Amino acid sequence: TGEEFEESYDKLILSPVAKPTQPRLPGVGLDKLFTLRTVEDTFCIKDYINANHPKSAVLAGGGFIGLELAENLRELGMDVTIVQRPKQLMNPFDADMASFIHNEMRKHGVKLALGHTVEGFEERDGGVDVLLKDEQPLHADMVILAIGVSPETTLAKDAGLELGIKGSIVVNDRMETSISDIYAVGDAVQVKHFVTGEDALISLEGPANKQGRIAADNICGGDSRYTGSQGSSVIKVFDMTAAVTGVNEAQAAKAG
């Protein structure tokens, strides 16, 4: 509602979401550009499609959201192109596994423009040009940005909590922050990777649910511990289901 007021507490749990990454590029504020993170974002995109009947879309980003968007827009009969800087979709997967996803997307008519850097957006002929470095622009009736998320930790920062990777909230294994009686859980907390033991930012529903239960148990006098996230995730695109857990080859090599 926008109302501001003060509230006292004995124990406080922060559970902020991750927010869509907004690139600082020319034209990012055009009215034919969208991001998708919340239910309201979904309604906004759906309303635009119902009102304007776009025939084509460019999706910037080839992660979970980008792939699921591509499938849904293809089901509506739209021409869909995914563009991103990495040369493979779904970075958590090894390249040889991602190649199967590439084939599945192409089989269902999704165009892939991989290894291209987006430099901005311009309106033209009733649509949007996606400007690429050293390449001809991609033109579409609408563009959806799905290039990742970052922690929404404005409140945590203002409160003076210790922050970590990408501004995430640092917690211990009891989900306690650097300030006594304040706990944090969910997409915006820094965790330990279960396999490597390194600090990580893993925004997934399963770990967030478990962290909430652990924080609640500790607030109620228990002694529950969060031992880390494995990064287990699964996606279904068209007729293929793909899953990943632990670390991929590149992460394993980096961790030694």
Please report, for each region that a protein language model flagged, where it lies by residue.
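Short helix/loop segments within enzyme catalytic domains
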Residues: 221
